């Protein structure tokens, strides 16, 4: 049985985004549910915002920094995926409710190790040429090539072959069943680009110089460093089941701080954005010219445990720290109430299938409430007083730094000594890509996410043997067996049960430290409406629903 090798994603922005800027991430909207409840939140969240009634004209949309590439295989962070998801299309399509189905391709499955796709007969690239099976095979093989410099080759590790079987048909043959692959094919790894264009542009493909060629509901109009990525509706878009965008253009711009974003939305210079831990959320929530939507948590706000020795390498110590951690304080001060005390690392926004099964299992896990007296008693029995742990942080990334400081306080409350390793925002990425960096600390904060709505999409990367984010080398045979079983299971409920079995152990052992089940927040001014309030903006045609209010 092959081991679980997740996508190779360096998380540059999953980290930077989480704090230095709060302009990124969302999943569904509505008033924030109470932070005092301990049951899973599956209601009270918005999927769709009110549909537009008129043309919005030119729309300006904020991401936390400028877009650096439009090459899907290089798109591993919020600015890139927010743009690629409306320019390019995956073989399968993620819907606003985070489920997925047929997209650019129609799926049939002759056996557990064969996925057949038929490209829609009407699908064309922006230049009018048809999307062919050859384009799809080229794109998937390019994403699967570990030498291609992309971030997703690992998700294809059970693929035996990808080949065109006709002008519009292709077959993916597997070495063994892999139902995670379908989720990936509805996401960035499954996005199809035009072979002729990509080959002609070579190393310039996906850059400001070379641009891109896709089939999505928007096409690239212009891209200038410092001025953003301007996209316009594709006038010959093939899929009539999607609404036609009610806008003239949408420009994604980089907005690196809360104050600039807040002022922009209030004055109309910025029309909207998806945000994380926005310090001015309360202010905007009461502004009559602004609409704030909160939704089911998709991303994981967590402390990565990278310790291989010392106190935090011991799950009993981690459990004591968890009991000492004031998560409600973090929710109120860092997330401004837009979250809940977690039961596990992955909460309701990640339940794309078998919702009742996942919900019941989540509720069965205890809420991670603070119990300082028990934490201190447990720590005393472990005889750890005076031992030292090192936490990686960056004071230049405010929300991640605040989470790191809260974690520090919890460690100190049970008698541990804490040293902070403070690095620049630009160097924080090294904790995710450099073994020397993550090996120099015992823990560091992250805002992390999978590629589709299933908890396994993240668990496979951080708790499986060989996982790209398994920085401590943690291995558990039962987790390995459960995740492997889930990967090969066709039935949604049975697959969920396998993931839940792994989740129970991952949660009990605190392989990573869940900090907050952070609601996904969408902010728009009164000029625009229609953007889905879910995390689909990273993977599906979200801006097709956008227009004038």
What are these regions (language model features)?
Residues 59-63, 128, 409-463, 496-498:
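Periplasmic binding protein-like
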Residues 236-283, 417:
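Ligand-site clamp/hinge motif
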Residues 60-111, 141, 213:
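N-terminal lobe/hinge region of extracytoplasmic solute-binding protein
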């Amino acid at each position: 049985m092959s081991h679980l090798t997740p996508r190779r994603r360096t998380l540059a922005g999953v980290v930077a985004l989480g704090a230095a800027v709060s302009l990124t991430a969302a999943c569904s909207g509505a008033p924030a549910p109470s932070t005092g409840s301990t049951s899973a939140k599956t209601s009270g969240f918005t999927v769709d915002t009110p549909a537009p009634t008129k043309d919005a004209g030119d729309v300006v949309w904020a991401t936390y920094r400028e877009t650096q590439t439009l090459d899907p295989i290089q798109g591993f962070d919020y600015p890139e995926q927010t743009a690629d998801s409306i320019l390019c299309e995956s073989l399968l399509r993620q819907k606003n409710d985070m489920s997925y189905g047929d997209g650019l391709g129609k799926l049939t499955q002759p056996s557990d190790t064969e996925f057949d796709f038929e490209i829609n007969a009407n699908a064309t690239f922006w230049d009018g040429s048809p999307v062919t099976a050859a384009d799809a095979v080229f794109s998937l093989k390019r994403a699967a090539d570990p030498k291609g410099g992309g971030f997703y080759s690992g998700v294809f590790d059970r693929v035996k072959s990808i080949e065109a079987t006709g002008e519009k048909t292709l077959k993916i043959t597997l070495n063994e069943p892999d139902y995670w692959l379908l989720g990936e094919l509805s996401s960035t790894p499954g996005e199809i680009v035009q072979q002729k264009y990509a080959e002609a542009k070579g190393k310039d493909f996906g850059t400001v110089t070379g641009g891109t060629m896709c089939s999505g509901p928007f096409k690239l109009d212009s891209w200038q460093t410092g001025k953003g990525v301007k996209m316009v509706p594709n006038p010959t878009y093939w899929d009539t089941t999607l609404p036609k965008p009610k806008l003239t253009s949408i420009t994604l711009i980089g907005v690196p701080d809360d104050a600039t974003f807040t002022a922009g939305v209030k004055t109309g210079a910025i029309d909207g954005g998806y945000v994380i831990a926005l310090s001015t959320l309360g202010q905007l929530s009461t502004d009559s010219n602004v609409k704030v939507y909160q939704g089911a948590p998709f991303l994981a706000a967590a402390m990565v445990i990278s310790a291989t020795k010392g106190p935090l390498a011991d799950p009993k110590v981690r459990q004591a720290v968890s009991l000492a951690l004031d998560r409600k304080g973090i929710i109120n001060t860092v997330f401004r109430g837009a979250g809940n005390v977690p039961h596990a690392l992955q909460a309701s926004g990640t339940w794309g299938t078998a919702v009742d099964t996942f919900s019941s299992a989540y509720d069965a896990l205890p809420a991670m409430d603070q119990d300082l007296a028990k934490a201190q008693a447990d720590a005393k029995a472990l005889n750890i007083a005076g031992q030292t742990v090192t936490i990686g942080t960056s004071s230049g990334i405010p929300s991640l730094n605040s989470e790191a400081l809260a974690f520090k306080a919890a460690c100190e409350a049970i008698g541990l000594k804490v040293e902070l390793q403070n690095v620049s925002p630009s160097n924080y990425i090294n904790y995710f890509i450099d073994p020397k960096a993550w090996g120099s600390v015992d823990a560091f904060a992250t805002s992390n996410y999978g590629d589709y709505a299933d908890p396994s999409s993240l668990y496979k990367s951080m708790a499986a043997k060989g996982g790209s984010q398994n920085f401590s080398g943690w291995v558990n045979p039962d987790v390995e067996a459960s995740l492997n079983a889930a990967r090969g299971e066709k039935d949604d409920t049975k697959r969920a049960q396998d993931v839940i079995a792994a989740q129970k152990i991952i949660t009990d052992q605190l392989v990573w430290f869940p900090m907050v089940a952070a609601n996904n927040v969408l902010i728009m001014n009164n000029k625009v409406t229609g953007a889905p309030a879910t995390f689909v903006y990273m993977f599906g045609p979200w801006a097709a629903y956008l227009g004038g209010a």
